C-alpha cells in the first residue's frame, strides 16, 4: 500500500506556474505620445484562434495594407490571424476609449467603452456610423462620459452600434440649485461577455440614461438633508442586449435606497460572469443600498460609524431562464472613509469555481486574515460557484511605498487551465504614472501565487483554450511601443496526473462530510506529501469528515482503468 502511494505521488507534480511558449509577437510604435498613455489595451482571443487588440492612437498608421487614420485621440480595433498576419483594422475616429472586448463562437467581436463629442465608427466596407456624446447647454463636453457598444463581424464590417448618452436627473433639476459640471452624469460600461446567443454587460452610471424603453437611473444626495447641496450618486446594473445592441433586459441593479441619500454613499463597482445558464453579479457598495433582481428587492444597511465605513461585496446567482435569484451573499470589510480601494474588477467562471479579482485596502472582504500592504493590494478570490463560499484567496502583498502617494492598480485577469493570470502595476496616486509592472500566476486549486517580474507593463490579457493573448507597453527614447503577442500555454493543471481512463466524477468539491462517486470504484486518498490517508474498495461514497482541511489527491480505479482527481476538504 505504501509503495502504491509513493508511486502515485511520483506521478503527481505540483506546477508553480504553466509553461508559456510564444507563438508570435507584433507591435505598433510611436502612434501615441507617452503623455497620452492610458495603460490599458483590452485584447481577446476568438474560438478560431485569432487575436483582437485595441488601443489609443494620435498618429495615423498602416495595418493590413490600409491606413488607419486618427482624429484627436482615437481608438483602434485590430485583428491578427492565428499566425500573426494582419487581417484588418478599423478606427473609432474621435475622442474614444475601448474599455472591454469579447467575441462570440462565430468570431464576431464586440467592444464597449466611452466617448465624447462626435465619434465615427469605422467599417471595412466603408459604411461608417456616427454617434454624438453628451452636450451641456448645446455644446459637446470634452469628458468621455457617454457609453458605447459596437459589433464587428469576422471581416471587420460594422454590424451594429449603440450609444448611451446620459442626462440630468429630473429630481435634481427640479431643486433649482443643481449646477452639474462635465462628467457629473455619465454611463460607463466596464465589462461585456457573450453567452448562449446573448451579449451581457455591466455598467456604473450617474444621471438618467435611457435605451429601448429601459432606464438606468443614478441616485442623488441632499447633503445632511439641509437642502443646500445636491449632487449625483453612482448606481450600477447588469443587463443584456438584443441583436441591434439595444438593451433587452436588466437582470440586476443596485442604487441608494429610495434613490436619495443624505450622505455620499454609492455603488463602488459592478461586475459579472456568465456560464451555463447562470449569471453571477458582483457589487461593492457603501451606505443604504437596494439590490433589485427581477421583482425581488433586497435592502442593505452598510454601517457607517465613528468615521469607519463598511464596504459590502454583494454576490448573487441569477437563473437566466426566468431572471430570478437563487442566492445572494454579502462579504464585508471596513476601513476609514478616506481613500477606498475595495473593488470587484473582474469575475470569471471556470468549472465549479467563481473567480473574483480586484483591489482592496485594510482587510480583504473574502478572507479577513489577509491584510493589505501599504495603500492597497491586488487579490484573487476563488469561490464555489454553487454556494458562493470561499475556497481560497490570495493577495499581491506588494509594498508599493508611501500610503499617501502610491497604490496598486488592477489591470485584468484570465484563466488558463487551473491557473489565473493576473496583471497590474504600482502607480503614483495623483498622476496614475506607472512605477512597477506586476504579473501573477495563481493556482486556483490551492491558492498558491507566483509573482513574475516582467520587463514591460502588461496592459491587456485574455485566453481561449490553451491560447493566451497579452498586450504590453514599453517606452524607449520617449517613444511608446504597444506589443501584442499570442502564446501557447501548457502544463496548466495545478496537479497533473499521467493516469487516465476511469471516467469517474467526484462530488461535492470542496467537500465537508462525504465524497460521492458517479461510478462504484476503488478509492485511495493521498495527501500532498504522498501518504495514503484513506482507502476503500467498490464504493459509491466515502466519509471524509475525519480528514484535516486541505487538498488531497483521489485515486479512482474501475475495470476501465485508473484516474486521479483533486479534492479540497473544508
Indicate residue ranges for each PLM-predicted region:
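The N-terminal extracellular segments of secreted preproproteins, especially immediately downstream
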Residues: 5-6, 341, 415, 520
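A sequence-level/structural motif corresponding to short, flexible coil/turn segments enriched
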Residues: 16-494
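Bacterial Sec-dependent N-terminal signal peptides
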Residues: 1-21
Amino acid at each position: 500500500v505504501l509503495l502504491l502511494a509513493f508511486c502515485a505521488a511520483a506521478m503527481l507534480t505540483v506546477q508553480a506556474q504553466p509553461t508559456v511558449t510564444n507563438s508570435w509577437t507584433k507591435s505598433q510604435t510611436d502612434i501615441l505620445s507617452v503623455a497620452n498613455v492610458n495603460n490599458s489595451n483590452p485584447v481577446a482571443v476568438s474560438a478560431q484562434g485569432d487575436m483582437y487588440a485595441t488601443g489609443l492612437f494620435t498618429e495615423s498608421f498602416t495595418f493590413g495594407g490600409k491606413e488607419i487614420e486618427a482624429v484627436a485621440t482615437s481608438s483602434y480595433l485590430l485583428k491578427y490571424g492565428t499566425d500573426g498576419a494582419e487581417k484588418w483594422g478599423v478606427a473609432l475616429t474621435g475622442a474614444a476609449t475601448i474599455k472591454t472586448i469579447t467575441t462570440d463562437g462565430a468570431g464576431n467581436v464586440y467592444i464597449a467603452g466611452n466617448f465624447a463629442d462626435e465619434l465615427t465608427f469605422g467599417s471595412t466596407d466603408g459604411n461608417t456610423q456616427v454617434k454624438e456624446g453628451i452636450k451641456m447647454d448645446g455644446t459637446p463636453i470634452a469628458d468621455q462620459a457617454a457609453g458605447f457598444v459596437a459589433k464587428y463581424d469576422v471581416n471587420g464590417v460594422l454590424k451594429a452600434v449603440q450609444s448611451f448618452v446620459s442626462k440630468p436627473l429630473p429630481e435634481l433639476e427640479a431643486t433649482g440649485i443643481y449646477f452639474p459640471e462635465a462628467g457629473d452624469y455619465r454611463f460607463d460600461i466596464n465589462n461585456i461577455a457573450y453567452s448562449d446567443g446573448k451579449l451581457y454587460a455591466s455598467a456604473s452610471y450617474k444621471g438618467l440614461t435611457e435605451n429601448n424603453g429601459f432606464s438606468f437611473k443614478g441616485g442623488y444626495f441632499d447633503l445632511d438633508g439641509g437642502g443646500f447641496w445636491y449632487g449625483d450618486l453612482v448606481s450600477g446594473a447588469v443587463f443584456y442586449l438584443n441583436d441591434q445592441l439595444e438593451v433587452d433586459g436588466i437582470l440586476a441593479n443596485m442604487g441608494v435606497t429610495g434613490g436619495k441619500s443624505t450622505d455620499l454613499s454609492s455603488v463602488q463597482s459592478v461586475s459579472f460572469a456568465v456560464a451555463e445558464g447562470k449569471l453571477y453579479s458582483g457589487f461593492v457598495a457603501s451606505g443604504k443600498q437596494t439590490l433589485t433582481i427581477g421583482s425581488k428587492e433586497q435592502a442593505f444597511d452598510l454601517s457607517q460609524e465613528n468615521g469607519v465605513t463598511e464596504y459590502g461585496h454583494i454576490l448573487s446567482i441569477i437563473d437566466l431562464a426566468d431572471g430570478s435569484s437563487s442566492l445572494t451573499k454579502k462579504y464585508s470589510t471596513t476601513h476609514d472613509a478616506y481613500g477606498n480601494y475595495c473593488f470587484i474588477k473582474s469575475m470569471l467562471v471556470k468549472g465549479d469555481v467563481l473567480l473574483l479579482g480586484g483591489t482592496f485596502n485594510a482587510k480583504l472582504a473574502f478572507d479577513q486574515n489577509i491584510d493589505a500592504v501599504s495603500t492597497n493590494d491586488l487579490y484573487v478570490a476563488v469561490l464555489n460557484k454553487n454556494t458562493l463560499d470561499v475556497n481560497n484567496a490570495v493577495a499581491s502583498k506588494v509594498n508599493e511605498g508611501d500610503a499617501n502617494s502610491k497604490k496598486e492598480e488592477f489591470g485584468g485577469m484570465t484563466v488558463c487551465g487551473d491557473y489565473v493570470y493576473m496583471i497590474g502595476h504600482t502607480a503614483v496616486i495623483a498622476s496614475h504614472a506607472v512605477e512597477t509592472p506586476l504579473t501573477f500566476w495563481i493556482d486556483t486549486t490551492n491558492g498558491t501565487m507566483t509573482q513574475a517580474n516582467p520587463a514591460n507593463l502588461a496592459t491587456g490579457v485574455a485566453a481561449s483554450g490553451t491560447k493566451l493573448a497579452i498586450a504590453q507597453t514599453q517606452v524607449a527614447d520617449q517613444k511608446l511601443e504597444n506589443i501584442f503577442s499570442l502564446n501557447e500555454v501548457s502544463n496548466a493543471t495545478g496537479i497533473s496526473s499521467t493516469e487516465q481512463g476511469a471516467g469517474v466524477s467526484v462530488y461535492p468539491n470542496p467537500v465537508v462530510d462525504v465524497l460521492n462517486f458517479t461510478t462504484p470504484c476503488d478509492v485511495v486518498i493521498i495527501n500532498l506529501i504522498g501518504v495514503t490517508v484513506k482507502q476503500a474498495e467498490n464504493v459509491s461514497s466515502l466519509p471524509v469528515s475525519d480528514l484535516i482541511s486541505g487538498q488531497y489527491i483521489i485515486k479512482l480505479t474501475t475495470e476501465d482503468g485508473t484516474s486521479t482527481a483533486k479534492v479540497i476538504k473544508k
